[in-house]
Structure formats: structure tokens, C-alpha cells
């Protein structure tokens, strides 16, 4: 007899309580087990990778976790910190000790010389307390890209649970977007995405990138999305 049985297909939309698999599988996020059976906990897309099975929700708020890479917007400058909008229930706090390697005289220094309201930054979630207060850091060595202020470009926001589709399996979608559009694209776990064109015509490239990201969000439940989008981007691009 097989070691496990699957009752759904990869990328299939499932609902809470739906039987996904039975046997020796690894039940991951969005699932629960009863005996040797695995069920869906949410309405979402099945993701099967070998023995591992998970369900990616079709919609939901950003739930911060330590280690998350996020794109934030500075809301307020305090005496020794900044308040950052990361799309969490409460503003995140960025202490000066987690933002600057240099020592700063807080009596003499206005922190807005470093970051001011409206600035877009990349950061890593350092800590989340029981009431979902988030503490950020810009001093993490293992971040996927440089941390700190982002300049120029455009910012687009999507449902945070659609972020895995923008990235794609093994990074396939995001790599294709960067290559075809000639853009740097920074994807935050909080569903905020920064786009900046590397080549002319920059405005057109950025607008098409934003449009593409919106299409991914809208069509995230479809199979073959990467190939479909690649074909359409090549048709729509005029450079």
C-alpha cells in the first residue's frame, strides 16, 4: 500500500474541513490533523511539495512574526525611535539602537535627519509581543536585501496572503518579473511591494510592474500563472 494518499491536487482551492491527505505526510500551515488524516483549516490554495502539504489562505490580514522582512512607511519621529506603518494592527517601533550603528546624542540630534515621515524603508521584524506590538531592526546581517530607506520607485499593496504567489515557487515569478520588466522588486511579507525600474522608459516599466502584481493578486488561484503573465507582459511591453 502507498505510504500516503492525496485527495486534492496542487493549486486546488479547498475549504475548511476538507480532507487533503491520509498517511505519512508533513502537515504544514493552514492544515490540521486527525489521526493520520490531514484537513484544511482555511479557504485557500493547496501547495504540495513532496510529502509536505499546506494551504495558503485566499485572504487575510498581515500577522507579523520575528524574522519577517517587511516594507514599512515612517509615520512619526519620536525622541529615541520612529513609528513605522507595517500594516499590522499597531504601528511598529524602530529604536535608534536597532537602526543606526553609530552612537547618537539624542539630546542634540533630531532623528528626522535619518528618517522622516513618509519615508519608505525595508526592515526585519525583531520581536512581536503578545498584543502584536512589533519591534523592527535595520541591523540584521541575513536580510534578503539592504535594509533602510528606499528612494524613488513606486509602492503597491496587496493582500499579505498573496505574497507567496508574487514570489512563486523557488522564486520563479519574481525572477521572471525582474527580468522581463527590467525592475528591482522588493517584496515585503506584509504585502507591501516596492518597484523601481533600472532602465528606460522607467515610468512605463514601473506602471506595468504594478499592473502585473495586481493581476497576480487577482488571479492567484489559477494554474500556470507565471507562463500566462510572461506571455502577456512581452505583448504589452513596447520597449
Curated annotation (Swiss-Prot):
SUPFAM superfamilies: Eukaryotic type KH-domain (KH-domain type I), Nucleic acid-binding proteins, Ribosomal L27 protein-like. Pfam families: ECR1_N_2 (PF22625), KH_6 (PF15985), RRP4_S1 (PF21266). Residues 151-217 form the KH domain. GO terms for cellular component: cytoplasm; exosome (RNase complex). Keywords: Cytoplasm, Exosome, RNA-binding. It is found in: Cytoplasm. Its main location: cytoplasm. Residues 67-139 form the S1 motif domain. The keyword Hydrolase does not apply. One of its GO terms (biological process) is exonucleolytic trimming to generate mature 3'-end of 5.8S rRNA from tricistronic rRNA transcript (SSU-rRNA, 5.8S rRNA, LSU-rRNA). Belongs to the RRP4 family. Non-catalytic component of the exosome, which is a complex involved in RNA degradation. Increases the RNA binding and the efficiency of RNA degradation. Confers strong poly(A) specificity to the exosome. Component of the archaeal exosome complex. Forms a trimer of Rrp4 and/or Csl4 subunits. The trimer associates with a hexameric ring-like arrangement composed of 3 Rrp41-Rrp42 heterodimers. NCBIfam families: PRK04163.1-1. This is Exosome complex component Rrp4. The gene is rrp4.
Amino acid at each position: 500500500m502507498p505510504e500516503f494518499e492525496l485527495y486534492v491536487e496542487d493549486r486546488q482551492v479547498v475549504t475548511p474541513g476538507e480532507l487533503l491527505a491520509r498517511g505519512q505526510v508533513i502537515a504544514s500551515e493552514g492544515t490540521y490533523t486527525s489521526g493520520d488524516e490531514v484537513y484544511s483549516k482555511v479557504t485557500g490554495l493547496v501547495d504540495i511539495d513532496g510529502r509536505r502539504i499546506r494551504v495558503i489562505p485566499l485572504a487575510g490580514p498581515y500577522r507579523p512574526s520575528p524574522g519577517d522582512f517587511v516594507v514599512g512607511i515612517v509615520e512619526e519621529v519620536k525622541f529615541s525611535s520612529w513609528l513605522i506603518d507595517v500594516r499590522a494592527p499597531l504601528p511598529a517601533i524602530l529604536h535608534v539602537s536597532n537602526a543606526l550603528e553609530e552612537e547618537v546624542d539624542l539630546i542634540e540630534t533630531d532623528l528626522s535627519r535619518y528618517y522622516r515621515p513618509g519615508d519608505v524603508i525595508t526592515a526585519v521584524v525583531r520581536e512581536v509581543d503578545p498584543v502584536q506590538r512589533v519591534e523592527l531592526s535595520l541591523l540584521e546581517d541575513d536580510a534578503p536585501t539592504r535594509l533602510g530607506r528606499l528612494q524613488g520607485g513606486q509602492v503597491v499593496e496587496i493582500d499579505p496572503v498573496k505574497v507567496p504567489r508574487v514570489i512563486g515557487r523557488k522564486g520563479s515569478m519574481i525572477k521572471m518579473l525582474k527580468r522581463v520588466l527590467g525592475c528591482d522588486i522588493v517584496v515585503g511579507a506584509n504585502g507591501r511591494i516596492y518597484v523601481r525600474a533600472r532602465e528606460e522608459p522607467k515610468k512605463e516599466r514601473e506602471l506595468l510592474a504594478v499592473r502585473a502584481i495586481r493581476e497576480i493578486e487577482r488571479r492567484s488561484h489559477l494554474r500556470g500563472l507565471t507562463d500566462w503573465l510572461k506571455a502577456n507582459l512581452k505583448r504589452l511591453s513596447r520597449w
